[in-house]
Each structure stands twice: as C-alpha cells, then as structure tokens.
Amino acid sequence: NNDETAHLKEVVLEFTKTTYQSGPIELVWVTDVPIPFWNPKAGNDNYFNNYIYQSWTYKGNTIGTPFITSPAINEKDSNIVTNNRVLAFYFAGLYEYNHLQCELKYSYSINKGTYSVPIGEKGQHSMMFKVGRDIPSLKDLHVQLCVGWDKGAFLGNSFALGVCAKKKF
C-alpha cells in the first residue's frame, strides 16, 4: 500500500534543575566590606516566592514551568509556592504511521519542597498518550483517544481516559 508511511515528526527533551538556588557563597557585610562565607544553604533564593511582589506567579499559577508547584493546589489556603526545589526530566514525541497520529508525553520529577520547608525527595511520574486519526469517509472529522496517568509520592496516583471527536467547518 503506497499510503503506508511512518515517521517521527517531533521530539522534545527537557531537563530542569532548581535544587541549588544561587550557590553556596553568602556575602556577610562587615562595616562596608562584603566578606564571602561558605554556606550550603546560602542561595535560598526561594524561587517563585516573594513577599513584596507576586514574583513568577499570576492569579495563583506559576509562570514558566509546570514543575514548580502552583499555589492553586496547596492543601492549606496559602498563596506561596511550597515546592520550588525540583529536578525534572521531560520527554515528548509525535509519531505518525499510516495516517494515525500518536503523541507521548512523559515526565519524572524529584520534588524537595523549599529550603525553609523541605519535604525530602518525593518522586513523581506523569504520562499522557494520545492516538488520533482523520476519518476519510466523514470529511473533516478527527477522532482521538487519550490516556493520562500519574504515579508518585508527591501528587499521588491518578488515571484518566478521554475520547474526542473534532469536526472542522
């Protein structure tokens, strides 16, 4: 069959590390002279948290990376980011075979909380797999099946299944 084609269309690999914020050198001011001291917790920039302005959050959501946990999902009614020390790996791929589009997104993160409130090292797997196809006999109709899965000590375990039909006009 001449219509059978297979090819990888897109690949994304990402690595995020915010576990070591600003390094171990702390400047201590003695009169007018800054003296550097070694302190393993000196960085403590506390990414995404600032008590004067909103920092990298907007209406309770973090901006820039999904791995820094949004204040919107805090168990307690708190407007701060409670997990900004993260080591994360992300992979995404889009593959097409014989008019069937397959998409996979997978991430693994190690979540450490903040310097002031550490939570140990809580691992979290997250995966989404989507397969879709245009239906030639029904012009401009596209159907998809999607599966999502989370497993880990940080956000817990969950599973979701979705079915979608799209019609273009």
Protein language model annotation of sequence segments:
Residues 1-169:
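Outer-membrane beta-barrel pore domains
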